[in-house]
């Protein structure tokens, strides 16, 4: 038996802002009789993605004679990190029984009918969401390296020291997945914190802040849906945006772990300036194609960063119910002027960054994510790549456990490095003299165990607060000592952070 959920029946998007793993939610259910609820099934339109919600409890709020019954449904959602905010949803509650034994009054709506008048279409402005998140943490290294660095880490690179990773402000209006005509959205996101050392667009706020905590622009883009070519249409993103490539993201609310993989740190781009299209060929298949100015680059040539050259981003996405695949590539010249020699045209040599993310949901609690990565730079003849495997398991509505294993090969000692100075990373990217070090030809292995703890019954303004403790072990698997200031083959670290959302 199906009951309509009127809160989700309007065009206004229902947003669930989540840290990877789980999110508590409360929804109202209206029916002519109080239902006995087994499960709640929500379908994200256009992608035909089905998310199953475990129903933890139902409480009848009002049930006067011959009147509608209102039941509040509390549950938990487990989500892929790139599906942090859902748009308008079609929803239904599947019920095995109806508690009332007598027939409902004939004047009351039947369970299959909408029991409330249709909501007026939401205004465009009412679908805008604004939020803040604050992330801070620390990573403890019992070896106490002399240089104070956790080698192989970037965003958690400071050993035995606290970091204010991000104080971020986000304003967004996502595209309406139910739109049948032209629809327009946007996303603006910027932050202040230590993460900005590694996320700058070259030429934007990059060398003006010689300190640990810096300002950075992450997203400044326009979203457009146009109903052309296919029944489901095309989505366009134009401006400055985080890369769609890879499993982990800059925004910490989209990641399960505090620390990042070698793939995220050294094997994929982080941001682009340009545009790309997502063509929804069918509910199963999406095709990606776009042009941008390069890896972490802005408009124009800033420090010989190849921003004036053509760079291609493309690939495909598959959505087959429990199984999803996102396979993307980015191709274009990335080496700064002069880095290959005084008489070498760096614009003639491409870098190829290839990545595939395969997600499988065994059930509502257990999720597997496999990431495959390969990178090649023709200019220096360097290759690298590997695989990362994640498993997460929902233990309770408040606690989710996870494990991540990774093997990543730096064949030529070109990609993996440490950057002790606040400007070393951006100076290396633009060919300037810098204090970075690395050059180890080896295979890196890492395994991380962690937990996400989300306290329940928090005030709405800070609902979603999460603590992420983790223990991580890194090891060079082939004849190198990159850790503990170049003295050790391996490294133990213990990290913890907290992400505090402020919801408006």
Regions inferred by a protein language model and the residue ranges of each:
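Cationic, low-complexity basic patches in intrinsically disordered or flexible, solvent-exposed regions
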Residues: 13, 42, 53, 61
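Short hydrophobic alpha-helical segments enriched in small aliphatic residues
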Residues: 31, 60, 67-70
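N-terminal periplasmic/intermembrane-space "pro-region" immediately following the signal or transit peptide
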Residues: 55, 66-68, 72-153, 430-434, ...
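Outer membrane beta-barrel
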Residues: 116-296, 306-310, 317-324, 390-413, ...
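Outer-membrane beta-barrel pore domains
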Residues: 155-156, 196-199, 207-210, 321-333, ...
